Structures are given as structure tokens and as C-alpha cells.
Amino acid sequence: MSNFAQGQWFVLRRSQTIPSLGLLAVLVTTCLVTDLLARNRSLERWTMAEITEFAIANGTLFSNTGNFIDFEDRVLLDEIPHADYSRGGIYFFGTSNMKWAFTKWDLPTDLQRFIGNYGIGASDHTTQLRLIRYLIAQRGFLTAGEKDLVILGVSFHLAHIDDPSTDYFGSLLRRHGLYTTTSDGNIVPVPMSALDRWLRIEKARSGGFFWNIGRVAKSWLVAHAGLAHGPLPGLFGTPDRLRGFMGGEHWQQNMDAQVQQLRETISLVRSHHAEVKVMLLPQGTWMDQLPYRARYESLIRALCQSTLTPLIDLSRSMPDNDFVDSNHMTVEGQEKFRGLIMEEILGHLHEAGIY
């Protein structure tokens, strides 16, 4: 190749490389800026405050997602990995009516660190037991012993039949490739490098950041365009659909099996010298027309009596108009509920000498 041809080839390659490097620099910078914004706690609090106000205005459900796509992503990818369980605290477990029962993002930071709301949507007592086992085995949960208080928020929904094809928690664990379950149902992290894990978490955080900006925009549009339908308290779904959700003709046997899982959960927590209480969560009066509530609550009372487990009965503590749908509370309802349990929270933290 002549010197002239070599020179032309070099100029061509340089003319291609510089724009490519420039584009790469723009992409990297965009990703870094997005991640920095997504990790900004002040911006996160502003987003949650805006979504809260629009939830009040539109009469919709508020979910504390932080800068993630949903509540559970925030808990699994951000809150739990940064939790310090060595000092003790108070931790709530349950299904969706527990996770959306109260918020803590607007509490003082030094109080937030001792409170965990680990509700998982569409879960049952088996899922709660597996989650607690994971936290103990992988995260050092309950290492503070008597300084820990676990409150199991319960309702008959935790005794439903989980359809494997629509297993929300299983799909949640697999969503980012960070967790999996063993053949016996234990939750374990997928082996990978620290860098790979960090990149996956930050990708989830950045995606959630854009998702929540979209939530703010959509909520603003609904509020200002008069499209809000307001709360829709009342029974959701037909009796047949609810019966299928609870296990069809075998709903009683399934309920018994799930309550047994709750018994095992209580035993597990106590084996680590932690305190445990059961809380019957608020229910609308429309639940009285179903056979599930009365039987489930009867089983829970018997279980608490036989295991000497304190029972906090808040099942009828909220009026129907504090529900946004059949089973979840409005923002005003969440604030009232937090007021009801704050004495329990502060009482334990003061007694344990950690707040």
C-alpha cells in the first residue's frame, strides 16, 4: 500500500472513530447523569410528595416506590441491602394491604432506619416465611434478638391459592436476574460479580426514575383534565372469582395449611429471641358477606391463644370511606393507620433503647 493510500485509510478511520467515541461519551454521560438523579434522595422525596398529593386529589392508591418501578423493587434492591439489623427495629410483613397500609418515606430519617415495611403484593403466609428465612440467612436479620419486633400483618387474603403461572413474587425475584429460588423454595442470590450486581440494580433504579416521572405527569393530567374517578370502595370481583382466588372448593383446607405456615413463622422468629405479634389488618364491611374472613380470623385468634402470641386487632378500625378499593386504603386512610400503630412503633423502639 502506498504512503498516500495509507494516509487516506488513516483519515477515514479517524473520521469514523471520533464520532463513534463522541456518541459513546454522550451515552455514558446520559446514563451517569440519569443514575445520579435517580440516586438523589431529595429528588426522590419530591417525587413521592408530588405523587402523594395527586393520589389525594385523584382519589387513587399511593405506593411508596421511591425511584423504582414498584414498592417491592425498592424494598428488595434498595432498602434491605442498606438496612442495619444489628441495632434492632420493628418490621412489618404481610401482603398488599400491609405494604400499602402506611408509609415511612416522610418520617424523620433517624426513625425510618428502625422501621421496615416488607409487605409483598399477592403473597401468602408461605411467601412471608420464605422471605424471613432469606433475611435471616443472607442479611443478618434478627441478630439484635430482643431488640427486634416482628409484626405479621394478616388478613384472609394471605390464605389464597397461588397460581404458579401468575406467581408475582417469583417473577419479582427473577425480574432483574438477581435472585432465584432453590428446589425447596429458599430464596438465594444469583452468583455474579459485584460490578454486575451493581449495574443491574442501577439499571432498575434508573428505569424506575423515568417511570415515576411518568407517574407524576400522568397524575397531573388526570387531576387537571377532570378524569379522576375517585375511590371505589367495595367488593371487587364476583363471588366465583373470589372463591377461585381462595382455592375453590378446597379453600378451607388451603386456609388451614397457610395458617400452619404462620405458626412456623412465629416459631422461627422466636427461635432468634425476637418478639413477634400478629396484627389483624383493617377490612371494609363488605368483607363480612364472604365466608373467608370469619373463619380465618377465628383460626388466627386460636393460633395466637395457643402460641401465646399478642394479637393486635385493627380489623374494624377504619371506616369504609378510608378505602380506595376493596382492600387498600386511601392516603388519608394510610395516615390514620400510621397514627394507630405509631404508639406500638415508638413504644418498642423506646423500650429497646434504640430511639
Question: Which ranges hold each PLM region?
Answer:
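Second-shell loop/turn segments in exported
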Residues: 92, 117-122, 248-255, 288-290, ...
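Extracytoplasmic/secreted proteins, especially bacterial periplasmic and envelope-associated proteins
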Residues: 127-130, 190-197, 208, 257, ...
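A generic structural signal for well-ordered alpha-helical segments
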Residues: 108, 269, 303-304
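Secreted/periplasmic serine-hydrolase-like ester/acetyl group-modifying domain
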Residues: 154, 163-272
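Membrane-embedded segments
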Residues: 86-182
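Histidine-centered active-site loop/cap adjacent to the catalytic His
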Residues: 3, 325-355
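Extended hydrophobic/aromatic segments used for targeting, binding, or gating
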Residues: 276-327, 331
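N-terminal secretory targeting modules
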Residues: 1-88
